[in-house]
Each structure stands twice: as structure tokens, then as C-alpha cells.
Amino acid sequence: MDFLDQVLADRELRTALAGGLDAEPTPTARILANAIADAFGPGALAVIHYGSHAQRSDARADSAHDFFVIVERYHDAYLSLTSAIDTSVGPRTAEVLAHVLPPNIHAIRAPDGRDGRSKCAVLTLRGLRLAARMETADHFTQGRLFQNVQLLWARDDQSREDVSSALVEMRIRTYQWGQPFLPQSFDAETYCRVLLETSFSAEVRPEGDDRVTQLLDAQRVALLPVYSALLDGLTRHGILERGKDGYRQVVFPPLAERRRRQRYFRISKARGTVRWAKHIALYDGWLDYVVQKIARRSGVAVELTERERRWPFIFLWPKAILFLRTRPQQRRMRK
């Protein structure tokens, strides 16, 4: 029996944990979400807004908006997408790649390209539910969707309910993957910080030491009430107890569980690194996107020669290896 079964069945708690999903987005995010839904056609079930624009965490006006597009079936979704916009691969190739290290990532612009651009992760409802239940091989989806996100568009009431339910379960199960890294006693802010730090450790990222603090500060108003409600719910169900510092674990996880979770996150990082090859094949303008993100997040300006732009798979390796060895995240790990 899942030790979180009673928590997952707590209707009052689930209502509290849906907080923020219906928050009002920016006009640009709304326009992009509607354009994305149109592009994926009748097989689109929902569009979830996540990332720096959703969190209001230092996003620039010209940076891409991040979305998860939840679809019924990859086949139908990609037939619609490839007929609506120009893509780097055909529908059959995209469908095949969707089953290899999901999700696929695509760049999609609003009509006429006037209202920004979006970076879309495409996942079936089944795939979202597997991620919510911690039944995926890596942390890509969970690491993004446990944060402040908005459900901007849904095909119908049932689709909205299905996707909201999966997002709420994802929030509940943060305790499942975060518990081994928590101190014996903690408060809601420490809980959120540990979740962010643990998720960041599972990916190769360009950010410096202060990125987790920036994210926590930007999402504080949205995240702390949600995860305070979760911790209160875990206390009601006997998984936590009240302590002088907020909450206290009733049963501290054994060392074997911590090692198992550490192994999961190491595998997740390896899968995330390999997944970049798929992003390159699918994401139009991937090279400029990566260079801009490195500059924005790490402060490192990467100047590319014409030869590196034309044949990146041949000539870009020395700069890529140098950055991976000297990025702020790597320097922090060596301390």
C-alpha cells in the first residue's frame, strides 16, 4: 500500500493544493496558449504554463514562454501540428521520438510571430499521469510542474479535471522524492528550497549558486501557501508532526532510501543530457536559444563563429566541453 494513499484521497487537501492553477496569466501567455491549442488541433487536451514567465522570475520580454501541451494521442496531435506550422521533422518522426526520452520539445510562434514565442513540451495525458505517480525514469516533468504553474487552456471540463488532478498528485508526491533530502525538522520555506535544490541537481544547468534563491523569492507567494497546506495535510495523516521549527518527520528515511533516490536523480541527469540530442533535432533555432539562455543565466557570453553555426556538431564541441567543465553549477559541486 502506498504510504501516501490516505493523503491522495483527502478531498479538502486536494482542493487546497490546486491553488494557483487558475491564476490569471499575462496577455501574451494567453495568446500563445490559445495559438498552441489551435496548432495541435482537436487532440489537444490542455496547455500548462510554467517556467520563468509563469513564475515572474526575471524573464525577459524576448525570452520564450514555456508550456506543457497535454494531448490525447501523439499521432493525431502531430498530424495537426505539422499541417499548421513548419516543423523540422514530419509527423511520423515526431511521433516516434515522442516515445524516446519524453517529452518532445518544439518552438511555436503565435500568429504572425508578433506576440512572442513558446517552447512547448508535448506529453500525453497518460504520460502526465505516470509522471504524477512517480512512474517515470527521470525527473524532467516533475521538476518543472511541481513549481508555480497555470492551467491556461483545456479542451473541456473533463480535460481540465484530469490535468488538474495529475498536477495536484504531483504536488503531493513531492514528499515522496524530497523526503530523503529533508532535515529532521523543517518549515515550509525549507521544504520548497530542498525541492528546488534537489531538482536542480538532477540536470545540467547554466545557473549560478543564487538561482534557487531567485526562484524561491519569485514564487514565494504562490508556493508557500500550497506546500504549507500539504505539510499540514501530512501532519493530519500522521506522516509528519508539529515541532518547534514547524514540522518534524515521524519516521526518518533509512540510508538505503536516500541512496535509491540519489541513484534516481543521477539517472535523471544522464537521461536529461542525452535528451538534448532530441531537442536539437526538434527545436527550431535551438542554437540561438541555448546561447541566449547561457548568457542570461550564467553571465557567460558565448561567441559563435560562422563555421560553428553552420556545422555545430563538428566544430562546437570544444566550447561545449569547456562550458560544461566551468559552468557555475559544476564549480559549486566541486566545493
List each language-model region with its residue ranges.
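Catalytic core of pol beta-like nucleotidyltransferases
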Residues: M1-A39, G43, I48, A54-D62, ...
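Short hydrophobic/aromatic beta-strand micro-patches
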Residues: I70
